[in-house]
Each structure stands twice: as C-alpha cells, then as structure tokens.
Amino acid sequence: MADRSDIIIENYQVSPRIGFLPDKPPLARLPHPYYAGWEETISRVAPSRGDGRAREYIDEMPLLSTGKLRVLPEWHRAYTLLSILSQVYIWDGDEPSNRIPASIASPLLAVSEHLGLNPCASFASFCLWNIRPVGRHGLNYAAAYEPENLGQITSFTGTTDEEWFFSISAAIEARGGCLIPGMFDTIEAAREGNSQRVQEFLGTLASCVRHMCKDLKRMYEGCAPSVFYHDVRPFLNGGKGVNKDTQTPGGVFYENESGGGQWHQYQGGSNAQSSLIQLLDIFLGVDHSITAANKPHEGYHREMQSYMPGKHRQFLQLMSRLSNVREFVLCHPVTAEIRIEYSRATAELVALRQTHMIMASRYIVMQGRKGSMCRDSSKGTGGTEFMPFLKDARDCTLATCCPRP
C-alpha cells in the first residue's frame, strides 16, 4: 500500500485547495493565433443559437490539428470549446443532427485522447474548465469560489441562469475540494489506530458537506426552473439516443478528414460525472450495490468515470485502494463516539442527495408536467432514468450509516 509521503496529489491534476478544479483559472481564449478560427466560430455561434445559422457557421470552421497546443490549460480550453461546439451542432435545430463534421470531430477525438476522457461534452467542459473567478481575491480561494464571484467563459444560451447553474456546481467543487489533504491524513490516522484524529476529521467533513448542501440550495437565487428546462437542459443531452429508432447504429457519426468516420454513443453532461461526489462515496465507503433496487445503477456510477479527466479517474482508483475509514470505524463499539460522528458525516451526504432529488424534481419533472417537450423529461442529461437513480444513490448512502445501538 502506498505511503502518503509518496503521493503528490498535483500529479493527478488535483488541487489541495480546490480539489478537481484547476488551481489556476481556465483560459478564456487559446493564445496561439492558429486557433483563431475555433475561437471566432464559438463567438459567432452563441448569438446565433436558435436562428438556424449555428450549424452553417460550424460547417465553415477550418479543420485544425492539435499540434500547437502546448500546456495543460490550452488542452482544457480546446476540449471545452470543441465539445461545446459539438453539442450546439447536434442540438441547435428543429431536429438533432446525427453527425458532426470533421472540423470538430477530428480534433475533439485527439484532445479527448490526450486528456483521457470521452470525446463529448461533460461535467469537465461545462463546469471544471469553463468557470473562473471574476474580480481580485488573491489567494483567498474561499471568497473567489463563492457563486457570486464566478463567471462562465463560454455559454450555450447567454443567460445568467445558465451561468449561475454552473457557478453553483463549481462552488460546490471548490468547497469540498479542500477536504482532500485531510482525507489522506485521516486514512493514515486509521492505519495508526488514532481514533481521535479520524473522529475529528469526520466532524470537519460533515460540516463541509453541510455547507455544500447550502451552496446547492442557492441554485434558486439565480437559475429559474423554466429557463433551465427549456433553454439550458437541451444542450446538455448526450448523443446516445439520437437516431435510435432508425436503421443507423444510433448515436452520432464523427466524420473524419478523408470522408469516413465512426458512430459514437455517449451520455450527456451530468453531475454524476463529478469526481468529488464519487470521492466522498469512496472515502466514506458508500456501496452502490448495497440495495437490490440499485443493482442496475451500480454500473452507471462506474461508467460515469469514463467521462472524467483521466488523471481524476486515476485518483479515484488510488483512493479506492487506500480507503479504510469505514472498516476502521466499524471496529469500534456500537456506542463509540467515532461511529456516531461517522454516521453524522454520512447523513450529511444523504441530505445533499435528498436536496439534489428535490431540485431535480422542481427543475425537470415539474417543468415537464407544465408543457410538452419532445425529449424525454424522465431521463437525466446523463441518459439514465434520473429519479430512480438519485433515489437509489440516496438510499445506498443512508444504508452506509452505522447501526444505532
């Protein structure tokens, strides 16, 4: 088993201050003039969304290589830009497109391979690498990542509702990200049999998740359910279900420069792709196969890791090997304070998931009942039946709490 001193979390592109968000704000524009065509296209597409010209502009975009991308933030910007363009191309029209041109598909495939995630829009392109602090906060990360101090770089709709939606997600990521160094210290404390240190951190974790839940509840301040449902949500859908009722294989055809290509089926962007939430599960020992009802969804949690940046996925795999906190806690008597503190921490994660369920109902289910929408409102943007999935994730977390004496 790896020793904590051998692990440098920055090697996994994880910040000790804000977790899976990049330590330095994402680029707002690719610096090399070679990529001006990409940046100009995205700036033309956003205002023209809905008038039928977005695909026309993208079809005019030059086919560029990734050879002039140098540093990691440039790769992040390229992935964000290309994946958003792919979403606009698929969904901005009366009917979804079942193809994306080589000018998007070819570099998107290359960039995604470099970053180790699927070549489609994801939580990383919507949130991690597309939200940045605005204003001057120096090294005060807590202030910089309050939702009101965040701004969106590239938008689908140009609405403040969309910006607020993703700013809330980024604020939650930053809030929980600062727990990561303490997780390593707590795993080491459990190895050493230091119950007091483990108990203290569980209290810290519970408080942090409670604040994450408060951040989530702020969604209502700046994102109207109707705007999210009708304007933002359609662009978060995946291409997996496109053409599923025709003679084609289904999904989206990624064209290449020689005129050929390949069919791909990918889910849409979803908070289930948050590495932070899966990390909390891993650290606390939440087992998503613990209930019979959740069996069909167990694989979905694993599938969502393929939509995470490769280094983040490797980090979760590392933490899965190291995690020992639940096992350590259960070695204590039923009445021990450490078991009570563990259950409190787990209960806060249950509350976060319950809040998410309520919000999903208000923003999607209730909006779907108010009017018709051609796309299935029972499915989340990640492509699964989302209410049963959210309920089962909550129930598995609840089942993780220590039995009461």
Curated annotation (Swiss-Prot):
This is Indoleamine 2,3-dioxygenase acdA. Heme binds at H312. Pathway: Secondary metabolite biosynthesis. Indoleamine 2,3-dioxygenase; part of the gene cluster that mediates the biosynthesis of aspcandine, a pyrrolobenzazepine alkaloid. Initially, the indoleamine 2,3-dioxygenase acdA accepts L-tryptophan and performs the oxidative opening of the indole ring to yield N'-formyl-L-kynurenine, which undergoes the spontaneous deformylation reaction to provide L-kynurenine. The kynurenine 3-monooxygenase acdD then hydroxylates L-kynurenine to afford 3-hydroxy-L-kynurenine. 3-hydroxy-L-kynurenine is activated by the A domain of the NRPS-PKS acdB and subsequently loaded onto the enzyme. Its EC number is 1.13.11.52. GO terms for cellular component: cytoplasm. Its cofactor is heme. Signal peptide: none annotated. Keywords: Dioxygenase, Iron, Metal-binding, Oxidoreductase. Gene3D superfamilies: 1.20.58.480. It comes from Aspergillus candidus. GO terms for molecular function: heme binding; indoleamine 2,3-dioxygenase activity; metal ion binding. Belongs to the indoleamine 2,3-dioxygenase family. Binds 1 heme group per subunit. GO terms for biological process: 'de novo' NAD biosynthetic process from L-tryptophan; L-tryptophan catabolic process to kynurenine. PROSITE patterns: IDO_1 (PS00876). It catalyses: L-tryptophan + O2 = N-formyl-L-kynurenine.
